[in-house]
């Protein structure tokens, strides 16, 4: 039997779905036959039953926990929070500048609540479906098609996320090194070449961390990464009171004019608005323009963490669905506040002049400011330490798809990890710009992972609730909303390509 699939067992109502086995890498061998319930468990609600092996049926609950999770509650919060936060935080001020403060808060609230609701659906489906593997839930619900849909969505979304992180390394790290070494002419210097640097960082930092088998070890790097993002947020708030207005507008316009004279095609769309002294420092609460349509995909992608939910759940100490939902609520609320504050203070610093990447806007105003240089280092550290966490669900998906029935092998484990990292590096090095491709893949995959797959799995696998129940109707509405969001976002991106219009990045 696969590690994450077990027979049913009675537990108390306060501990629904407590204590699955922790075995993300399939290194244990178990009997393949599922046990039937004894009669004295027959009246227990299926949602409040647990899974165990046939050979241990009838034993007390504490005797069935052969491979309990080992990751603490706090470390799980760190891991999930780090899976949520990412490069999207750099684009949220741009999203607010193109939606207005009030509309942005409304969208951010709805997206965060919907994302948390989909985590609830996913955990409940995992309990009812008897599996802690995303792809296996897809297989149980819709056969091979469901398995491929889950695996493909996970892989697409995470490779897109990894690419965005490594693109930040590629373009920001050379600038940091150049500022630290005071080198004006970087021609021919390999250590100022972004392609070489992204390869070096991948080999020296990312690969060793990615080879860990247990996510708990990365909790420490997750905590450090989150501290880097908190530092970034603090600097964004402080700079709001240090950068005068409307002086920064004039500086941005001058920078734009200089860029236009040397590189006419390098115009930044966020700077193309007419600026008046009256409007340049006045916040807007509702804005609708050609760039507003990119706000929803940016926000959706910013909250995608669902491929990492089940692995984190599997390794949670004293795990139960209620305990994991508490982990999720804390993580989502913390990221909601971080996203809101970063977007708000970034927007109130530059207003409609904010660019699609917030750090670039600061560099246009303050140049080589020491504090901003430290922020760049912090962001680089954060995204670098996030990549190993993102690799885990990709490797799990590939392993389950290709080698589900095989025992764990370090050679296979390492080969899959190196292959994933190598493919992502090739994308970053050889694709001139991944923004449009990433936007299309991110919009489709993120909508699949947040809206469509969890609700579809829930409707199919949770048998104890009739289709006319409030829960099933809510899940169906959630599914239809996901289809609408996915098709709408993809259509708008295609229209953006057709009309060759500049778009916002994530």
Curated annotation (Swiss-Prot):
GO terms for biological process: alanine transport; amino acid import; amino acid transport; cellular response to arsenite(3-); L-glutamine import across plasma membrane; L-proline import across plasma membrane; L-serine import across plasma membrane; neutral amino acid transport. It comes from the Eukaryota. The modification Phosphoserine is found at residues 12, 21-22, 55. Residues 1-76, 124-158, 210-217, 314-329, 393-413, 458-472 are cytoplasmic. Residues 97-102, 178-188, 239-292, 351-371, 435-436, 496-506 are extracellular. The chain crosses the membrane at residues 77-96, 103-123, 159-177, 189-209, 218-238, 293-313, 330-350, 372-392, 414-434, 437-457, 473-495. InterPro entries: AA_transpt_TM (IPR013057). It is a multi-pass membrane protein. Na(+) binds at residues 82, 386. It is found in: Cell membrane. Pfam families: Aa_trans (PF01490). Polyubiquitination by NEDD4L regulates the degradation and the activity of SLC38A2. Keywords: Amino-acid transport, Cell membrane, Disulfide bond, Glycoprotein, Ion transport, Membrane, Phosphoprotein, Sodium, Sodium transport, Symport, Transmembrane, Transmembrane helix, Transport, Ubl conjugation. The keyword Metal-binding does not apply. Disulfide bonds join 245-281. Glycans are attached at residues 258, 274. Residues 1-23 are annotated as: Disordered. Inhibited by N-methyl-D-glucamine. Inhibited by choline. Allosteric regulation of sodium ions binding by pH. The extracellular C-terminal domain controls the voltage dependence for amino acid transports activity. Symporter that cotransports neutral amino acids and sodium ions from the extracellular to the intracellular side of the cell membrane. The transport is pH-sensitive, Li(+)-intolerant, electrogenic, driven by the Na(+) electrochemical gradient and cotransports of neutral amino acids and sodium ions with a stoichiometry of 1:1. May function in the transport of amino acids at the blood-brain barrier. May function in the transport of amino acids in the supply of maternal nutrients to the fetus through the placenta. Belongs to the amino acid/polyamine transporter 2 family. This is Sodium-coupled neutral amino acid symporter 2.
């Amino acid at each position: 039997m696969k590690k994450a699939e077990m027979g049913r067992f009675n537990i108390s109502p306060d501990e629904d779905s407590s204590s699955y086995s922790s075995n993300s890498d399939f290194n244990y061998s178990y009997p393949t036959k599922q046990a039937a319930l004894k009669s004295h468990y027959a009246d227990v609600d299926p949602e409040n039953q647990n899974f165990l092996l046939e050979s241990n049926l009838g034993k007390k609950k504490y005797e069935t926990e052969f491979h309990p999770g080992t990751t603490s509650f706090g470390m799980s919060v760190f891991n999930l929070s780090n899976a949520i936060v990412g490069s999207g935080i750099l684009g949220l001020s741009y999203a607010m500048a193109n939606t207005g403060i009030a509309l942005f808060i409304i969208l951010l609230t709805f997206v965060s609540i919907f994302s948390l609701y989909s985590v609830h659906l996913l955990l409940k489906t995992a309990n009812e479906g008897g599996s802690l593997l995303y792809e296996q839930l897809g297989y149980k619900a819709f056969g091979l098609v469901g398995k491929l849909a889950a695996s493909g969505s996970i892989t697409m979304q995470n490779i897109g996320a990894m690419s965005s992180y490594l693109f930040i390394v590629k373009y920001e790290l050379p600038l940091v090194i150049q500022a630290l070494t005071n080198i004006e002419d970087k021609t021919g210097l390999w250590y100022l070449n972004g392609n070489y640097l992204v390869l070096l960082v991948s080999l020296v930092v990312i690969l060793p961390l990615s080879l860990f088998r247990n996510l708990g070890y990365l909790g420490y790097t997750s905590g450090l990464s989150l501290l880097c993002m908190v530092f970034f947020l603090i600097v964004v708030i402080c700079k709001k009171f240090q950068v005068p207005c409307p002086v920064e507008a004039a500086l941005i316009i001058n920078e734009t004019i200089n860029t236009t004279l040397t590189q006419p095609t390098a115009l930044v769309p966020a700077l193309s608005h007419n600026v008046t002294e009256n409007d340049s420092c006045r916040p807007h609460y509702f804005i609708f323009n050609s760039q507003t349509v990119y706000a929803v995909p940016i926000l959706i992608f910013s909250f995608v963490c669902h491929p990492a939910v089940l692995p984190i759940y599997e390794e949670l100490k004293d795990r139960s669905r209620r305990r994991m939902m508490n982990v999720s609520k804390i993580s989502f609320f913390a990221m909601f506040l971080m996203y809101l504050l970063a977007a708000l203070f970034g927007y109130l610093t530059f207003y409609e002049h904010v660019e699609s990447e917030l750090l670039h806007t600061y560099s246009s105003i303050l140049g080589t400011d020491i504090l901003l240089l430290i922020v760049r280092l912090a962001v680089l550290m954060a995204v670098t330490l996030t990549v190993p966490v993102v690799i885990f669900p990709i490797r799990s998906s590939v392993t389950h798809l290709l080698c589900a029935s095989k025992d764990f092998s370090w050679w296979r484990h390492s080969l899959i990890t190196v292959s994933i990292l190598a493919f992502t590096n090739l994308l970053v090095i050889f694709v001139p710009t991944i923004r449009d491709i990433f936007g299309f893949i991110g919009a489709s995959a993120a909508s699949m992972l947040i809206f469509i797959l969890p609700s579809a799995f829930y409707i199919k696998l949770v048998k104890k609730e009739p289709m006319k129940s409030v829960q099933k109707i809510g899940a169906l509405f959630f599914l239809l909303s996901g289809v609408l969001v996915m098709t709408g976002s993809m259509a708008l991106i295609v229209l953006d390509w057709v009309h060759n219009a500049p778009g916002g990045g994530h």
